[in-house]
């Protein structure tokens, strides 16, 4: 019996920093990061090229309480450094699972991580390595969602997979409204008109303009990542 082929050859996975916390209130939960890496490894074994953009909200958020009274640009740089810490942890967990991971940072920290160079990133992906993009876009005032849209467009990803704690986009908050229903798919224009808050406007506009679809799915739901990559009805597809 022949196995179904993956629906995508090259993907950009956007992981929030909060996703690494698991049930903890702060930081990186070891069991959670190991489970995530196992799911990523399963997808790479299908021959899919995986790049990751990771957030830093489990350590520091430039727009959150810890940054009150702080210069916004300074706070954003601190948030970028938090993403580097997360990227190193993720790469370490991947290397222990027999994956080969490369961290590429938008901010130069040469003793610790490689600088982001697009041709090198593409080479790593072609070689079957997982590339983890750290430090967002390298600029303050831009979110890691925008970094995911930017890197996704740069590397020619077929889709941005936004991993969240909810299994898609709903008509309302499913935890507050029991009648809320999940969208199977909707257009960028519909999502923007309904103000569904899937990504910030800059990230969303970039994906729309580059005709780069976004699929929102739950990273907590076991096997969801693989189902998304296989093109199954999982999460919510936002298309042009």
Swiss-Prot record:
<dbReference type="GO" id="GO:0006225">
    <property type="term" value="P:UDP biosynthetic process"/>
</dbReference>
<feature type="binding site">
    <location>
        <begin position="14"/>
        <end position="17"/>
    </location>
    <ligand>
        <name>ATP</name>
    </ligand>
</feature>
<dbReference type="GO" id="GO:0044210">
    <property type="term" value="P:'de novo' CTP biosynthetic process"/>
</dbReference>
<feature type="binding site">
    <location>
        <position position="57"/>
    </location>
    <ligand>
        <name>ATP</name>
    </ligand>
</feature>
<feature type="binding site">
    <location>
        <position position="76"/>
    </location>
    <ligand>
        <name>UMP</name>
    </ligand>
</feature>
<dbReference type="InterPro" id="IPR001048">
    <property type="entry name" value="Asp/Glu/Uridylate_kinase"/>
</dbReference>
<dbReference type="InterPro" id="IPR015963">
    <property type="entry name" value="Uridylate_kinase_bac"/>
</dbReference>
<feature type="binding site">
    <location>
        <position position="164"/>
    </location>
    <ligand>
        <name>ATP</name>
    </ligand>
</feature>
<keyword id="KW-0665">Pyrimidine biosynthesis</keyword>
<dbReference type="InterPro" id="IPR036393">
    <property type="entry name" value="AceGlu_kinase-like_sf"/>
</dbReference>
<comment type="similarity">
    <text>Belongs to the UMP kinase family.</text>
</comment>
<dbReference type="GO" id="GO:0005829">
    <property type="term" value="C:cytosol"/>
</dbReference>
<comment type="function">
    <text>Catalyzes the reversible phosphorylation of UMP to UDP.</text>
</comment>
<protein>
    <recommendedName>
        <fullName>Uridylate kinase</fullName>
        <ecNumber>2.7.4.22</ecNumber>
    </recommendedName>
</protein>
<keyword id="KW-0067">ATP-binding</keyword>
<keyword id="KW-0418">Kinase</keyword>
<feature type="binding site">
    <location>
        <begin position="137"/>
        <end position="144"/>
    </location>
    <ligand>
        <name>UMP</name>
    </ligand>
</feature>
<keyword id="KW-0547">Nucleotide-binding</keyword>
<feature type="binding site">
    <location>
        <position position="170"/>
    </location>
    <ligand>
        <name>ATP</name>
    </ligand>
</feature>
<dbReference type="GO" id="GO:0033862">
    <property type="term" value="F:UMP kinase activity"/>
</dbReference>
<comment type="subunit">
    <text>Homohexamer.</text>
</comment>
<comment type="pathway">
    <text>Pyrimidine metabolism; CTP biosynthesis via de novo pathway; UDP from UMP (UMPK route): step 1/1.</text>
</comment>
<keyword id="KW-0963">Cytoplasm</keyword>
<dbReference type="InterPro" id="IPR011817">
    <property type="entry name" value="Uridylate_kinase"/>
</dbReference>
<feature type="binding site">
    <location>
        <position position="173"/>
    </location>
    <ligand>
        <name>ATP</name>
    </ligand>
</feature>
<dbReference type="GO" id="GO:0005524">
    <property type="term" value="F:ATP binding"/>
</dbReference>
<feature type="binding site">
    <location>
        <position position="61"/>
    </location>
    <ligand>
        <name>ATP</name>
    </ligand>
</feature>
<keyword id="KW-0808">Transferase</keyword>
<feature type="binding site">
    <location>
        <position position="56"/>
    </location>
    <ligand>
        <name>UMP</name>
    </ligand>
</feature>
<dbReference type="Pfam" id="PF00696">
    <property type="entry name" value="AA_kinase"/>
</dbReference>
